[in-house]
Amino acid sequence: MTRALWIATALALASGTGAAGVSEPCAGRHGPLAPDDPRQREWFRVLVHQVAREEGVDPYALEALGMTETTLRPWLGRSCEVGAFQVMPWWAGIFRLDPPELLWDPRINAIAAARIYKDAWRRWDERYAHAGNNRALRAAGWRGKLDRATFAALTYNWGKAPAVFAQASDLRKVSIPASVAAYARRFSQALREARGRARADNDTPPGRSPRSRAGATRES
């Protein structure tokens, strides 16, 4: 599916919620807006990696974020989250997108996600690694210290995490919602899989031949 067709399909299906589209309750209409198509997913992976390099984000982390959210498919969330990265509509105001339906554009959706994720990544404190022993994370199957990439993903999903972690005297007892802990676990697995595919491809970025390989740009 081309970028133009993806946008047109998403807008057409989302328009059933009314003229405001993404701004109205979507619980009755949530779900994927296109069939699961491996070719479309690969097309979007290429786009995601391009955006990540431009935004100074680890491409594999951004890919893993999209895989965790929607398996990199156009999607309308229960609370009207938009696109493959499930960006909340109110971010359109922060990013000065007019109209907010621009968030359905796959590239814009990925850029928004990259910037939100990068902001979360910058909020890391080394002591947050001890949250790996948090009861909720352990119950979700987490083992070992919490890493920075997963903390950023956890914050992407649960925006209050930096404030809650900063105020906690014992990170083991922070009341992380079970759904958020499970999200962090899925992201970590998706990140390992993304990096595993890269190693299998000799670290060649999606959409590039080995001769044109470029190094990934990490968050800064």
Identify the role of each PLM range:
Residues T2-T17:
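Sec-dependent N-terminal signal peptides of Gram-negative exported proteins
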Residues G16-R41, V46-L47, R53-E55, W90-S220:
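Non-catalytic cell-wall polysaccharide-engagement segments
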Residues D37, D58-P59, E81:
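Membrane-interface starts of transmembrane alpha-helices
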Residues V48, M67-G93, G159-P162:
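Cell-wall polysaccharide-cleaving catalytic domain and substrate-binding groove, primarily
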Residues R53-A61, L65-M67:
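N-terminal secretory signal peptides
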Residues V57, L76-S79, G144:
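Short, surface-exposed helix-loop/turn micro-motifs enriched in polar/charged residues
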Residues A61-A64, G83, R148, A152:
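Residue-level detector of well-ordered alpha-helical segments, enriched
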